[in-house]
A protein has these predicted regions:
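Small-residue-enriched hydrophobic alpha-helices in membranes
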Residues: 2-79, 85-190
Length: 190
C-alpha cells in the first residue's frame, strides 16, 4: 500500500466516523425532542392546558409530569415566603396539603416542594406560575376555583401569624393575597 492509499483510507475512515457521530447526535436529538413532547402532553393532560406555548412555559419553569401537581400550590408557597422565610407551621400545612393532593413523601414533587420551602423561588416563578394557574382554571378541567386557591393561601398566611391569634395575617401576606386574588380571577392588580 502506498502512502497515498494510506492517506486516502485514513481520510475515508475519518469521514465515516464523522458521519456516524453526526447520525448518533441527530438520533439523540430526535429522542430528546420526542421525550419533551411526551412530557408536555402528559402535563397537558394533568393541567387541562392544551396551548403548546403554555406547556412550554411550564417546562421552562422546570415542571415535569411528576412535579406539575405542585402548580396550584405555588401561590401558597409565595404567601409562605411573604415575610422572608417559611415558618414551621406554614411548612407543616403546605406538606399536609401536598399529601392530600396525592404528593407522596420522597417523590420528585415532594423533593421540589422541599426545595421551594428551603430556598425561595425566583419572583419570576411566582408571576409566571400564577398566570399559568389562571389559564389552567379557565379550562374548566379542574374542580378547584380561584376562590379555593385564595382560601388555601389565606390558610397558609394564618398558619403561624399573630400573637394570641391577633393580626394572624401580616401586611406583607395581605398584600400578596390581594394581588393573587386579582390575578387568579383575571382582574387588574389593585
Amino acid at each position: 500500500m502506498t502512502d497515498k492509499d494510506i492517506i486516502a483510507e485514513r481520510g475515508r475512515s475519518l469521514e465515516e466516523d464523522y458521519f456516524r457521530r453526526k447520525d448518533r447526535e441527530l438520533i439523540e436529538k430526535m429522542r430528546r425532542a420526542a421525550a419533551a413532547e411526551q412530557a408536555r402532553a402528559e402535563m397537558g393532560t394533568k393541567t387541562g392546558l392544551s396551548d403548546p406555548a403554555l406547556l412550554e412555559e411550564l417546562e421552562g419553569l422546570g415542571f415535569t409530569p411528576d412535579t406539575v401537581t405542585l402548580l396550584p400550590l405555588v401561590p401558597a408557597i409565595q404567601v409562605a415566603w411573604a415575610e422572608g422565610g417559611v415558618t414551621a407551621g406554614e411548612r407543616a400545612l403546605l406538606t399536609k396539603l401536598a399529601r392530600t393532593r396525592g404528593i407522596a413523601e420522597g417523590t420528585p414533587a415532594d423533593r421540589q416542594l422541599g426545595d421551594w420551602l428551603d430556598r425561595r423561588p425566583a419572583e419570576e416563578v411566582f408571576v409566571r406560575a400564577t398566570r399559568l394557574i389562571r389559564a389552567m382554571l379557565s379550562t374548566g378541567a379542574h374542580e378547584e376555583s380561584a376562590t379555593d386557591l385564595v382560601k388555601l393561601c389565606e390558610a397558609i398566611a394564618a398558619a403561624s401569624g399573630g400573637l394570641f391569634g391577633v393580626n394572624r395575617v401580616s401586611a406583607e401576606e395581605r398584600q400578596i393575597l390581594t394581588s393573587l386574588a386579582a390575578e387568579l380571577n383575571g382582574r387588574p392588580n389593585p
